[in-house]
């Protein structure tokens, strides 16, 4: 999801900075021409912060306090905890609704930041859900998972399986003539 968002944002003219903790994914982002840096550095430069990680507090209070006055934050990841909104509230001297699903947090350091959808999943709370292309991939992955379960009935251990490792591109040796 993150790489697709970067592609679209760059196509719209954004100067995209990628904050990636996985070294391989960070290298891929750099090879695609994106600037890559830790969130602690990016916090000082960015105007709009979009999270798509699924990890807790990837944008934490100390990052937010370093952001420019007027920065925007949105979470499009997997859970409501990517932006530490509860911690942010402790530094807010005033919170006001600008419009539905957009709040201004006036902070005790004199800056203001704007949070979409109260830090919840902005693509679900503020919009009408996922685009059709995302749903197509989600349903295709679910179908592949069901196919795997059916083909391996009675052979599987009671554990989690990673779908992307089960279905890889065939090598030339795998293709029959």
Model-derived features with residue positions:
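Rossmann-like adenosine-cofactor binding region
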Residues: 35-111
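Short, glycine-/Ser/Thr-/acidic-enriched flexible segments
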Residues: 23-24, 55-56, 78-81, 120-122, ...
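Adenosine-phosphate binding glycine-rich loop
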Residues: 85-169, 173
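Metallocofactor- and cofactor-centric catalytic cores in central/energy metabolism, strongly enriched
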Residues: 15, 41-44, 48, 52-57, ...
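Conserved active-site and cofactor/substrate-binding residues in soluble primary-metabolism enzymes
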Residues: 21-24, 37, 44, 58, ...
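Single conserved hydrophobic/aromatic residue that forms the stacking wall/gate
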Residues: 1-7, 167-177
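Glycine-rich phosphate/diphosphate-binding loop of Rossmann-like nucleotide-binding domains
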Residues: 3-4, 8-43, 51
């Amino acid at each position: 999801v993150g790489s697709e968002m970067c592609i679209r944002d760059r196509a719209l003219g954004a100067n995209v900075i990628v904050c990636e903790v996985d070294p391989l994914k960070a290298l891929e982002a750099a090879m695609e021409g994106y600037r890559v840096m830790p969130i602690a550095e990016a916090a000082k430069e960015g105007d709009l912060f979009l999270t798509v990680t699924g990890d807790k507090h990837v944008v934490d209070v100390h990052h937010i306090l370093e952001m420019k006055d007027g920065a925007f934050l949105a979470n499009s990841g997997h859970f409501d905890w990517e932006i530490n909104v509860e911690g942010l509230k402790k530094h807010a001297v005033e919170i006001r609704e600008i419009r539905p699903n957009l709040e201004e947090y006036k902070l005790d350091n004199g800056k203001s930041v704007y949070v979409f959808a109260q830090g919840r999943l902005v693509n679900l709370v503020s919009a009408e859900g996922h685009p059709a292309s995302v749903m197509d991939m989600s349903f295709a992955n679910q179908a592949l998972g069901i196919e795997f379960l059916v083909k391996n009935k009675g052979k599987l251990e009671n554990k989690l399986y990673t779908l992307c490792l089960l279905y890889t591109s065939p090598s030339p040796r795998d293709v029959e003539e």
